[in-house]
C-alpha cells in the first residue's frame, strides 16, 4: 500500500504545513514512549524509531530526521543523557526510511525485508563508532553484548565485534 506524502513535491523539499507540524510532535511522542517502554522492559529491540519511520514515510526524510533528532535530544534531557549522542543515528534512520519509501521500497514484502536490512545497516554504521567511543563497543542489549564479549575474547577487532553487537 502506497501512502501519499503530506504536502511534498520532492523528496527533499520540506514544507512546514499544519499537518507536518502536527506529525512531528506526534512522531516524537511515539518514539519517546516506545523507547522508554523497550528500555523499561529490557526488550532486545530498539523501538525508539517507530515515530521516525512514520514521519519519514508520511512527510519525507527531512521530517523523519527532524522527529528522530528532537526525540533523542528530549529523551537525553529527561531519561538517558547518552541518548542525545545517538541523535545522529536517528537522523540517518529518518533519511534512509524517507528515501526508501519515496522510491517505492515498501511496496512488497520482499522489498520491505530488503529495506529493513538497509536501514539496519545504516543504523549500525552510524552507531558503531559511537558505541566504541562511549561504551567500549557495547550496546547495553544483553544478547548483543554477549556476542560482543565472545568475539572480543576470541581476538576479533573491537570495531567488528561492536558492529555485530548492533
Predicted features, each with a name:
Residues 2-58, 62-67, 72-73:
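Hydrophobic transmembrane alpha-helices
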Residues 58-59, 78, 104, 134:
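A broad structural signal for alpha-helix termini and local helix breaks/kinks
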Residues 75-81:
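Membrane-interface helix-loop junctions in multi-pass transporters/channels
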Amino acid at each position: 500500500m502506497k501512502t501519499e506524502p503530506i504536502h511534498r513535491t520532492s523528496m527533499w523539499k520540506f514544507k512546514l504545513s499544519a499537518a507536518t507540524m502536527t506529525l512531528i510532535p506526534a512522531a516524537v511522542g511515539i518514539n519517546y514512549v516506545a523507547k522508554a517502554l523497550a528500555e523499561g522492559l529490557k526488550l532486545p529491540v530498539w523501538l525508539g524509531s517507530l515515530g521516525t519511520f512514520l514521519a519519514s514515510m508520511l512527510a519525507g526524510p527531512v521530517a523523519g530526521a527532524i522527529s528522530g533528532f528532537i526525540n533523542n535530544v528530549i529523551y537525553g534531557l529527561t531519561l538517558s543523557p547518552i541518548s542525545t549522542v545517538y541523535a545522529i543515528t536517528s537522523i540517518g534512520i529518518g533519511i534512509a526510511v524517507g528515501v526508501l519509501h519515496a522510491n517505492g521500497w515498501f511496496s512488497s514484502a520482499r522489498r520491505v525485508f530488503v529495506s529493513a536490512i538497509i536501514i539496519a545497516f545504516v543504523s549500525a554504521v552510524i552507531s558503531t563508532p559511537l558505541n566504541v567511543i562511549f561504551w567500549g563497543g557495547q550496546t547495553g542489549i544483553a544478547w548483543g553484548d554477549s556476542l560482543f564479549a565472545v568475539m572480543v575474547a576470541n581476538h576479533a577487532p573491537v570495531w567488528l565485534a561492536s558492529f555485530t553487537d548492533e
